[in-house]
């Protein structure tokens, strides 16, 4: 029954919006500026997501939705550090471990609608060890605002929030909020025809996901 309910909720996010056929980030009004909810973000087991620990962020849509998030270098001709955040094509691929750290240094669990830093926790060479924090960068060629990994300062990397899609199903989305404003935008999927990869980018339609412990 839960699976059917989740499919129904997710279908609402997949309906086309003809008024936004061109990229136009949606302005969101955050429900809470601070953690006023008593329920933390929960993983697929129903356990609290702990601050500073590693998790997989995996598409909640089985099938065409893809798997988990990975840090890759889409430009094979470049020697730069991997910086592209993609959704794995395989449902069975959980992706790379991601550390979620609240902006509040006293927080022990991750609360919805509060600022977080996302960083990949993967082995890299010494030159790329700090190029793992999430941020947003504009791509002039495609016109997209992509989620990228790099040496973002804290003010730029902790502008993400986890928002509840359905609190009974432990399904969530991510919003990105412009620093110093209340304007927030959905983080969704963008299919890049040049690289044939599905990338995370600001979008009208959110990327709906579940959170898996890395020890599963």
From Swiss-Prot:
GO terms for cellular component: vacuole. Keywords: Signal, Storage protein, Vacuole. Accumulates specifically in tuberous roots and tubers upon tuberization. Sporamin accounts 60 to 80% of the total soluble protein of the organ. Belongs to the protease inhibitor I3 (leguminous Kunitz-type inhibitor) family. Transmembrane segments: none annotated. Major tuberous root protein. The gene is GSPO-B1. This is Sporamin B. CDD domains: beta-trefoil_STI_SPOR. It comes from the Eukaryota. InterPro entries: Kunitz_inhibitor_STI-like_sf, Prot_inh_Kunz-lg. Pfam families: Kunitz_legume. PANTHER family: CYSTEINE PROTEASE INHIBITOR 8-LIKE (PTHR33107:SF28), KUNITZ TRYPSIN INHIBITOR 2 (PTHR33107). One of its GO terms (molecular function) is endopeptidase inhibitor activity. Residues 1-21 form the signal peptide. It is found in: Vacuole.
């Amino acid at each position: 029954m839960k699976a059917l309910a989740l499919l129904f909720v997710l279908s609402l996010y997949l309906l086309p919006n003809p008024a936004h056929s061109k990229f136009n980030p949606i302005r969101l009004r955050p429900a809470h500026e601070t953690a006023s909810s008593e329920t933390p973000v929960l993983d697929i087991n129903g356990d609290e997501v702990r601050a500073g620990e590693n998790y997989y962020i995996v598409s909640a849509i089985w099938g065409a939705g893809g798997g988990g998030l990975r840090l890759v270098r889409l430009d094979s001709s470049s020697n730069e550090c991997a910086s592209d955040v993609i959704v794995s094509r395989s449902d069975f691929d959980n992706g790379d471990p991601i550390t979620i750290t609240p902006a509040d240094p006293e927080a022990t669990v991750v609360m919805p609608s509060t600022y977080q830093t996302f960083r990949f926790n993967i082995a890299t060479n010494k030159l790329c060890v700090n190029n793992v924090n999430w941020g947003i960068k504009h791509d002039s060629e495609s016109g997209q605002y992509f989620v990228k990994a790099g040496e973002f300062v804290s003010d730029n990397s902790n502008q993400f929030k986890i928002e509840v899609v359905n609190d009974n199903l432990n399904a969530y989305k991510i919003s990105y909020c412009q620093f110093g404003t209340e304007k927030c935008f959905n983080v969704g999927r963008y299919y890049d025809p040049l690289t044939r990869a599905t990338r995370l980018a600001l979008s009208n339609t959110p990327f709906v996901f579940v959170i898996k412990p890395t020890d599963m």
